[in-house]
Amino acid sequence: MLETLRERLLSVQQDFTSGLKTLSDKSREAKAKNKPRTVPCLPKYSAGLELLSRYEDTWAALHRRAKECASAGERVDSEVVMLSAHWEKKQASLRDLQQQLQQLPGLIADLESLTASLTHLEASFEEVENHLLNLEDLCGQCELERHKHMQSQQLENYKKNKRKELETFKAELDAEHSQKVLEMEQTQQLKLKERQKFFEEAFQQDMEQYLSTGYLQIAERREPMGSMSSMEVNVDMLEQMDLMDISDQEALDVFLNSGGEENTLLSPISGPEASPGQDAVTLQVPTPSQAPATPPSSSSPGTDPASRDPSEGGESPVVQSDEEGVEVDTALATLHSDDSDS
């Protein structure tokens, strides 16, 4: 478009210059025709000079105006080029807008479908959220059940361990108790044997002294021994007894022959603890008239030798204890009888 405009401007300029040339030529021909041929005239140089100067001025003005028109045409051409580019941009924008406007119904349909899809997705999201909440509740319940199961297992293991410890402790206590009971029984048996041996030795010494001297009288009393098998007992019962005269040798022989029975009689007396509630223990040696029929026996507590009948013999020997009484321990007597049986 600009090229055609330039070509037109150039053609107009050429036409203008050619028209000026033709006009100058025609004016020259007209002047030549107006001259009379017959009458010769002299050339007027001043008029030609003026005409030439006028033509030069006109040509210079035309040339200047042509340059101005060319510069204006160039400016118009640049503006037209810019306008054409701007128009092309606007045309492209209009085409794009037209295409977008043509696509607008499809876009609206897509938006409607997207809206429906979003609604469906919202419902799906709500359902998934509800399922997730249910799943979270189930996970919490499972975790709680697992924790309860672990706690119950720990409780069962704790109970088992405590039961095992209790059984072990019971077994240890039973073993310790049985061992202590066995040791106590052994020590008690040893103490009882020692006491029995001690009483037998004391009895033997007293009997030897009695056989050698004929009487047994103890001037001083011994203090009670310390505790044996958790009991305080009076020792040397025979040393605390006063033996009176014997009437004849036959009664002594009968008394010596019945030593086994007296040992059985004295064995429960050696074990028990002396009790202040009893009055006395009296041992009577039989007379020759009573020797074949009556063995020596222990009188009941509270028997007074001064109250005996003098018809039985005023000289009958009597063994009387200085203690207030003797309390018989049935348990020790039983153990002593078991030892004597064995």
From Swiss-Prot:
PTMs per UniProt: Ubiquitinated by TRIM32. Ubiquitination leads to DTNBP1 degradation.
Alphabetical list of InterPro entries matching this protein: Dysbindin
Region described as Disordered: spans on this chain: 263-342
Key word GTP-binding present: no
Transmembrane segments: none
Pfam families (alphabetical): Dysbindin
Modification sites for Phosphoserine: S11, S316, S321, S340
A single Gene Ontology CC term: nucleus
Predominant location category: cytoplasm
Keywords linked to the UniProt accession: Cell membrane, Cell projection, Coiled coil, Cytoplasm, Cytoplasmic vesicle, Endoplasmic reticulum, Endosome, Membrane, Nucleus, Phosphoprotein, Synapse, Ubl conjugation
Entry's Gene Ontology BP terms: actin cytoskeleton organization; anterograde axonal transport; anterograde synaptic vesicle transport; neuron projection development; neuron projection morphogenesis; platelet dense granule organization; positive regulation of gene expression; positive regulation of neurotransmitter secretion
Membrane topology reported for the UniProt record: Peripheral membrane protein
Known partners and oligomeric status: Interacts (via its coiled coil domain) with KXD1. Interacts with CMYA5, PI4K2 and RNF151. Component of the biogenesis of lysosome-related organelles complex 1 (BLOC-1) composed of at least BLOC1S1, BLOC1S2, BLOC1S3, BLOC1S4, BLOC1S5, BLOC1S6, DTNBP1/BLOC1S7 and SNAPIN/BLOC1S8. Interacts directly in the complex with BLOC1S5, BLOC1S6 and SNAPIN/BLOC1S8. The BLOC-1 complex associates with the AP-3 protein complex and membrane protein cargos. This BLOC-1 complex also associates with the BLOC-2 complex in endosomes. Binds to DTNA and DTNB but may not be a physiological binding partner.
Free-text function comment from the UniProt entry: Component of the BLOC-1 complex, a complex that is required for normal biogenesis of lysosome-related organelles (LRO), such as platelet dense granules and melanosomes. In concert with the AP-3 complex, the BLOC-1 complex is required to target membrane protein cargos into vesicles assembled at cell bodies for delivery into neurites and nerve terminals. The BLOC-1 complex, in association with SNARE proteins, is also proposed to be involved in neurite extension. Associates with the BLOC-2 complex to facilitate the transport of TYRP1 independent of AP-3 function.
Protein name: Dysbindin
Organism: Bos taurus (Bovine)
